[in-house]
Amino acid sequence: MVIPDTPTNRWNRRPRGRVAAVMTEQVQSPEDVQFWFDPLCPWAWITSRWMLEVEKVRPVRADWRMMSLAYLNLIQHEGNGQSPEYMERMSRAWGPIRVVAAAAGHSGPGVLEPLYTAIGTRFHVQGRREDPAVIPEALAETGLPASLAAAADSTDYDQVIKDSHNEAFDDVGLDVGTPVIRIRGHAIFGPVVTPTPRGEAAGRLWDGVALVTETDGFFELKRSRDRKPSFD
């Protein structure tokens, strides 16, 4: 017997009660994952692009947050074991994250991802890390006031950056860098990967990372990197 495809019968085939509520909740309530970044780091950039891919194939939503490589290396690690050239680069690393913090103060945390994308595309994909035009261009692209660029040379938002940074590193420890992600209350460094996994490959990596992160007593998986960051 074939049941006619009428509006009444379509309604009768819909999930009811608790089943319908659960299905609706699953569709409408993606899992929040905290992602700490410094726009200067090429490895964090690649991982952030992976995170955006994960959002397309898994019920996950990134909550973008700030950390500072300058604060980590110059203050918390006191520059130990770093070359003078690296220390000089770190001293300049304050600028971009200060602008990001000022933008969040101006427009709210929702601006973090688009501004990070605008800055990171220029820094990493276009290879313009030393170009002073990057910050003004990124602010213009995201519809933010050009005046926010002045925050690069101001300490007004340093405490905001440090507070966000410390939230991550109080959980994950000081012997790591960026990115830091927190999944279901468990913070880890990484994953460090290149090039960016896309589509279902991104989803499978997410599944594995989420699984090991929830394992009691899990601390580390690591091997030496044998290739440079790829921004394809």
Predicted regions and their residues:
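N-terminal amphipathic/basic-hydrophobic helices that include classical n-h-c signal peptides
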Residues: M1-V22
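Short glycine/proline-enriched loop/turn "hinge" motifs that connect secondary-structure elements
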Residues: Q26-V27, V180
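Local sequence-structure signature of Cys/Sec-based thiol-disulfide redox active-site neighborhoods
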Residues: V27-M51
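Short strand-loop junctions, especially beta-strand C-caps/beta-turns
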Residues: W36-D38, R122, V193
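Structural alpha/beta surface segment adjacent to cysteine/selenocysteine redox centers
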Residues: W45-I135, G208-V212, E220-R223, P229-D232
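C-terminal cap of thioredoxin/glutaredoxin-like
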Residues: W50-M51, R129-D232
